[in-house]
Amino acid sequence: MITQDKEFMSAAINYAREAALRGDVPVGAVIVQKGSGTECGTDRIISAGGNRKSSDPTAHAEMNAIREACRVLDRWNLSDCELYVTLEPCPMCAGAIVQARMRRVVYGCADPRAGAAGTLYNILNDSRLNHRCVITSGVLAEESKALLINFFRERRDKKITCTYHTGTNGSTMTM
């Protein structure tokens, strides 16, 4: 595993932690522009994002990072950029990655329910589409997976009580 991949994935994991603190699913992403740093030939993070799905079902970490990268660069074509994301992209995000012409996607843990970078679908390398990406999987996978497991475990462990009015006599039932 390339040291730089770990460095950029660590940054994505930090955005995933921020998402969890907001109550969103802990997925984080960063977009790195290749060869754009202050030193000749170095790479730099140009955008980042975490899930913000509480009011927008399309506000996945990848979508937020892509939107921000396009705004920062003032263009839609991100062919000189790489995406680092803690969870394998879903079909929607994979479609956006293809449309943005990103050259490479690096993800942490696989998504057996909606993974579109090879686990369930392989949209990023579908020969019927106009663009394909290099995919690197498993970078800091255990850390990424642990964030998700702990987040959903905490949600399940919180006891939710609901009070139902069961009749006209004012009786209630709490579950």
Language-model regions, residue ranges each:
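Short beta-strand scaffold segments in enzyme catalytic cores
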Residues: 27-39
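Residues that line or immediately flank small-molecule/substrate-binding pockets and catalytic motifs
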Residues: 33-34, 85, 109
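Helix-adjacent hinge/juxtasegments
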Residues: 63-100
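Short beta->alpha transition motifs characteristic of CBS
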Residues: 44-53
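Small-residue (primarily alanine) positions within well-ordered alpha-helices
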Residues: 12, 16-19, 29, 47, ...
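Zinc-dependent deaminase
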Residues: 1-19, 39-41, 89-175
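Short loop/turn microsegments at loop-to-beta-strand junctions
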Residues: 4, 26-27
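A short, polar/charged loop-to-alpha-helix boundary motif
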Residues: 53-64
